[in-house]
């Protein structure tokens, strides 16, 4: 992760919104460089750490919150739950998301695990913690990313524009008090450990569109190639 101003790395709207925590982002860059110096790699690749903030702040209408990046090398791309188009097999959480996508919307299974088309529709795929050590889930929790992502969520809420927050799992649900009057869809996490406890059948995609329509906003076209 390069030591450059946020305005050179992310969307202008996000650069302004995250200005109060820019020094924290700088500190996290220093932390990641120290990890490398100690012989520890991190995921995703440096140029993708802030990728969720490269899509326009003003266009976000659905927020999907993840926990931290996939710890498997080659999987994490800087967008929660998404992977690069060539990744096979898919992470099991994403497999479960696609199962619910099929059952909720009636669409065929997407050809890849790349969720970028959702981001281009105004769906923000944000992890609470933006980096992880390979093979060690949750290894960067409590290291300093949480104030950054919480600032981002407060900025989304402060716009007072139609938005639906989709919170999968207990970690994501702790953000609910920060969301104010934002419409929220909550369920267990799509992980194989919890998906059968209420994620399957929760219909997050169609419910998000129903809520957006009730607010007078355009629904999301969830179809993936």
Curated annotation (Swiss-Prot):
Protein name (Swiss-Prot/TrEMBL): Uracil-DNA glycosylase
Subcellular location(s) per record: Cytoplasm
SMART domains the record matches: UDG (SM00986), UreE_C (SM00987)
Similarity field: Belongs to the uracil-DNA glycosylase (UDG) superfamily. UNG family.
InterPro entries listed in its UniProt record: UDG_fam1 (IPR002043), Ura-DNA_Glyclase_AS (IPR018085), Uracil-DNA_glycosylase-like (IPR005122), Uracil-DNA_glycosylase-like_sf (IPR036895)
Major subcellular location class: cytoplasm
Enzyme Commission designation: 3.2.2.27
Disulfide bond listed as a keyword: no
BP GO annotations: base-excision repair, AP site formation via deaminated base removal
Organism: Mycolicibacterium vanbaalenii (strain DSM 7251 / JCM 13017 / BCRC 16820 / KCTC 9966 / NRRL B-24157 / PYR-1) (Mycobacterium vanbaalenii)
Keywords, alphabetical: Cytoplasm, DNA damage, DNA repair, Hydrolase
Annotated catalytic residues: 68
EC category name: hydrolase
Top-level lineage group: Bacteria
Record-linked Pfam families: UDG
The reaction(s) this protein catalyses: Hydrolyzes single-stranded DNA or mismatched double-stranded DNA and polynucleotides, releasing free uracil
Biological function: Excises uracil residues from the DNA which can arise as a result of misincorporation of dUMP residues by DNA polymerase or due to deamination of cytosine.
GO molecular function: uracil DNA N-glycosylase activity
Keyword Cytoplasm: yes
Source lineage: Bacteria, Bacillati, Actinomycetota, Actinomycetes, Mycobacteriales
GO cellular component, one term: cytoplasm
């Amino acid at each position: 992760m390069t030591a450059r101003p946020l305005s050179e790395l992310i969307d202008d709207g996000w650069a302004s919104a995250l200005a109060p925590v820019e020094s924290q982002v700088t500190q996290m860059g220093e932390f990641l460089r120290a990890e490398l110096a100690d012989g520890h790699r991190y995921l995703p690749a440096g140029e993708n750490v802030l990728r969720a903030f490269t899509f326009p702040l003003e266009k976000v209408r659905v927020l999907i919150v993840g926990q931290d990046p996939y710890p498997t090398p080659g999987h994490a791309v800087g967008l929660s739950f998404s992977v690069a188009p060539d990744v096979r097999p898919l992470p099991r959480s994403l497999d479960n998301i696609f199962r619910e996508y099929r059952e909720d919307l009636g669409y065929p299974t997407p050809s890849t695990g790349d969720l970028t088309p959702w981001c281009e529709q105004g769906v923000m795929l944000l992890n609470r913690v933006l980096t992880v050590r390979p093979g060690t889930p949750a290894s960067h929790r409590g290291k300093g990313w949480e104030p950054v992502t919480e600032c981002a969520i407060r900025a989304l809420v402060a716009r007072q524009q139609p938005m639906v927050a989709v919170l999968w799992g207990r970690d994501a649900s702790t953000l609910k008090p920060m969301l104010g009057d934002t419409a929220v869809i909550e369920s267990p996490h799509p992980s194989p450990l919890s998906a059968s406890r209420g994620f399957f059948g929760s219909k997050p995609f169609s419910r998000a569109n129903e809520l957006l329509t009730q607010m007078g906003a355009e629904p999301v076209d969830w179809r993936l190639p």
